[in-house]
Amino acid sequence: MASLIYRQLLANSYTVDLSDEIENIGYAKSKNVTINPGPFAQTGYTPVNWGPGEVNDSTTVEPILDGPYQPTNFNPPVNYWMLLSPLNAGVVVEGTNSIDRWLATVLVEPNVLTTVRTYTLFGVQEQISVENNSTTKWKFINLIKTTLSGNFTLYSTLLSEPKLHGIMKHGGQLWVYNGETQTLLLQDYVTSNYDSLTMTSFCDFYIIPRSQESTCTEYINNGLPPIQNTRNVVSVSISSRNIILNRAQVNKDIVISKTSLWKEVQYNRDITIRFRFANAIIKSGGLGYKWSEISFKPANYQYSYTRDGEEITAHTTCSVNGVNDFSFNGGSNPTDFLISRYEVIKENSYVYVDYWDDSQAFRNMVYVRSLAANLNDVLCTGGDYTFALPVGQWPVMTGGAVMLHAAGVTLSTQFTDFVSLNSLRFRFSLSVEEPYFSITRTRVTRLYGLPAVNPNNNRDYYEIAGRFSLISLVPSNDDYQTPIMNSVTVRQDLERQLGELREEFNTLSQEIAVSQLIDLALLPLDMFSMVSGIKSSIDAAKSMASNVMKKFKKSKLASSISTLTNSLSDASSSVSRNSSIRSVSSSVSAWTDVSNQLTDISNSVNSISTQTSTISRRLRLKEIATQTEGMNFDDISAAVLKTKIDKSTQIAANNIPDIITEASEKFIPNRAYRVISNDNVFEASTDGRFFAYKVGTFEGIPFDVQKFADLVTDSPVISAIIDFKTLKNLNDNYGITREQAFNLLRSDPRVLREFINQDNPIIKNRIEQLILQCRL
């Protein structure tokens, strides 16, 4: 393995002088470390909601009950109910097309015998005969005349206890409610000059879309919601509806707070989500009558749309969770039709849509709070799929439908073939809808849900409209760059060379091929092969090796090995215990005791995160001492170092010791290690994150810190080349077998090479991220 170079150096330089050890310990305690997460940091955790933020309203999500509005004269929109809410008896509404229809509605209180009342209709005093025999319900009387000078006649009536009445323009006619509450009917007026028909309301009213007609009927039967009957609800002018037409403010960047270096910006965006399902239909071998699997697969979709005049390029990834497995067996004969397993999503399932676009909001999606979204529902219906049998009538799976309801939004990361993108994951819950699905010419019928056989129903995509809002922490100056200055020391010339060499090394990370890196990491590199690409290195090999050893023995890695060697002889003397909580260090082991570091943080070692972080900082030494057949981080580190040395144009013999020593300390700073016990995996990283899960399902289990400490002492420690998040993402998007999972957990280089040769974007992205961490 490539990490042999570090083993050779440690074998000859683990002993250090006391003065060097004191200097290194003091340096380690005073060193400030800043981790740059990079432009594509993993942000898989739900953001903390620090405050309510601001979410502007827009017309993309239409309200059910819009109002109340003040009495006015206007031309009501088509296909919208005008829900009238009068308080007193009298004229409620007038309407006319100014040609051949004059319509009016008056309200009569309960317990009124037949009488003649005078109403002012269209500016004229009219004598109208009215009555209301009901003791509890108010009576709406709809009147009509065909000439301006004619007399009004009764057209229809409505008895309503809540005193609510509805009028709507639809289909070239004017529609009203008539009859009695709980048994309502719809009555239409035939009218000409339909578009110019205007209404004059003499009471407060609401606007309800025709798509919510059932809700409007419910209000007329039982009354408005309680919140509408309080004094806190004040009617406004109908002209306020026109404000929504100016929707530029919905897509806006608002500076919430600002300091000299940082600012909080709230991004409000309208959003159009387009997605599609993907599936896999696998036919069994044999005579052609049997299918082994019909399943959902993740689907990527890229598209463009216009947002406030701006052309937006968006990318979505659709996946499902909680699928239901169905099967059909037509018999045991080889020519009997059979589907071993086909997936169906139902009420217990979820659909995830990861969304990213090229707008400013997604360029700063690293530190995020107050994330909120509001989306419309979408109906997904299944299409037909014909099972082509060699002989006989062909069965057809047809139908099925589900409604997607927005159920939440979190941050996520999308992986493409070239880059990983910080994105929003919209989660949708499901409800089953008509029609049901069935398989013709079989007994499978009247089942509900959406099967995976043809989930898009020959559509290019499904579309959802809505909006989202988030607050992101970004630099105050968009053009700000941190200045880089060379340190002025007695080694000024060498430091300048090292600075230029570091910059060159860091830029070379983009040129390293992942597939070649894996092969190089498996080679047993030694000092000679490491520097074989440098001119005149053969002649100076002996002196160069001595210089590297001398420099390397002062490194933190060599210092830690020396401390470990001393602590192995008397591990129990350096164990610190806590009286209230059993510390990790209660395992009498030099691997779980971090020497004097643990004493310095004895007051904070109570948390699991601190304990696992304390252990994981020592696991590299444990791994070096107990080499396994799997690949480790030092193999990748040494392979990257070798590749960069070969590619470098500025490398020289005098700066090789500094480069190798610095690479051993700084390459891949964020590492995770794992131990395996039967079917359970315990994984901890140097930044304090920890996971415990099952191998087969990647289902989380409680993290037993004491068991983890014991396993670290007795079991091999494995570099988590493919960490838990990457494994879970790989399983969710592609699906992996139990054997593949075990091999990836053991960092088997053969399996890693197979995934890379298959151009798997998730595995390639993980290895590329490790390469990018190999910085000086």
Curated annotation (Swiss-Prot):
Domain of life according to the entry: Viruses
Short sequence motif YGL motif: positions: 448-450
Keyword Membrane: yes
Coiled-coil stretches noted in the UniProt entry, renumbered to this chain: 484-511
Assigned GO CC terms: host cell endoplasmic reticulum-Golgi intermediate compartment; host cell plasma membrane; host cell rough endoplasmic reticulum; host cytoskeleton; membrane; viral outer capsid
Biological process terms in GO annotation: permeabilization of host organelle membrane involved in viral entry into host cell; virion attachment to host cell
Other information: This strain probably does not use sialic acid to attach to the host cell. In group A rotaviruses, VP4 defines the P serotype.
Name this polypeptide is given: Outer capsid protein VP4
Organism: Rotavirus A (isolate RVA/Equine/United Kingdom/H2/1976/G3P4[12])
